[in-house]
Amino acid sequence: MKKGLVLGRFQPFHLGHLNLIRTVLKDKNEPLICIGSAQCAHTKDNPFTVKERRDMIKLVMAELNCNYTIYEIPDINNYDKYVSHLEEFVPKFDTVYSGNTLVQRLFQTAGYEIVIPKMINREVWEGATIRQAMTEGDEWEGAVPPQIVDMIYHLNVIERLKNLA
């Protein structure tokens, strides 16, 4: 089976991520899910730890009934070396699935096939927008899978975000 790479920070895991993973599966590829900025946690832009992000992914993937693997990718802050850096952590993959133009450019330059998913509700299904809605008391629950809503409340992430702001 071919491997499809999905790279995200998952801060939090939202419906856009789920749509991306479903696209990988629809193409009959096995998802290799890479948690970017793995070393970052407890900041305004990265409130979740890598363990919490891994747990979110596992919660959602359990319902998709498929093979997948999660990898943790720390930042190196060097775009020229990023693809080779990621390749040190992840086995061979065939295709990169991403709606992020920087990710598309970096991996296309390195010779990878790129699949750009149909973007749905991009204005709402976006990590920064979701985190901002949480801190401002706006509706955000519709942008993440239900089990992630429960996890966010259980971890008291809204209070965490307010303390980080």
List PLM regions with ranges.
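Nucleotidyltransferase catalytic core that binds NTPs
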Residues: M1-A165
